[in-house]
C-alpha cells in the first residue's frame, strides 16, 4: 500500500457516515494525471446520488490533511461504488465475498496454474477455498491469501 492510499484511508474512514463504509482507496495514473478513487458501499448497494453527496463531504476533508500527501500538480477525485466486479484486497473483502463467483491471480503457480475462476467456498482469514471447474468436474483449490496478487468478484453468465 503506498503512502497516499494509507494516509487517505486512515484519515477518511472515521468521516464516512453510516450506513456507508469505506471499501477501498486507490491512487493510480489516469492519462497524464493522478486519480484518487475512493470506493464506498453500503448493504444493498449504493446509488449514484449518494456517491455525489459523499464526494461533496470528502473533497473538502482531503484539503485538511496535513502534511499534504498530494503532488503539487493536483489530482482527480472519484468517489464511486466498487461495482459488480469489485476488487478483493483485504481479508474482510474476501470474507464478504464467500459464495460469490471470483477471479484470482497468484504470484506463483498452484497446481500448475496461476489464475483461477470459480465460487469462493470459504475464507478462514488466511486461506481461501475456490471451487473451480477442471474440464468436467469441480474441485476445491486452497489458496493462501499471501499468494494472491489480484482478485475480484466476477459476474457469472
From Swiss-Prot:
Q: Where in the cell is it found?
A: Cytoplasm
Main function:
Required for maturation of 30S ribosomal subunits.
Which cellular component, as a GO term, is one annotated location? Answer: cytosol
Does Magnesium appear among the keywords? no
Q: Which gene encodes it?
A: rimP
Q: Which SUPFAM superfamilies match?
A: YhbC-like, C-terminal domain, YhbC-like, N-terminal domain
Against PANTHER family, the record matches this protein to:
RIBOSOME MATURATION FACTOR RIMP (PTHR33867:SF1)
Picking any one GO biological process from the record gives: ribosomal small subunit assembly
Alphabetized, the UniProt keywords read: Cytoplasm, Ribosome biogenesis
Q: Which domain of life is it from?
A: Bacteria
Say which family it is in: Belongs to the RimP family.
Q: What is the lineage of its organism?
A: Bacteria, Bacillati, Bacillota, Bacilli, Lactobacillales
- Pfam families for this protein: DUF150_C (PF17384), RimP_N (PF02576)
Name the predominant localization.
cytoplasm
Disulfide links within the chain = none
**What is this protein's record name?**
Ribosome maturation factor RimP
Q: Show the Gene3D superfamilies listed in the entry.
A: Ribosome maturation factor RimP, C-terminal domain, RimP-like superfamily, N-terminal
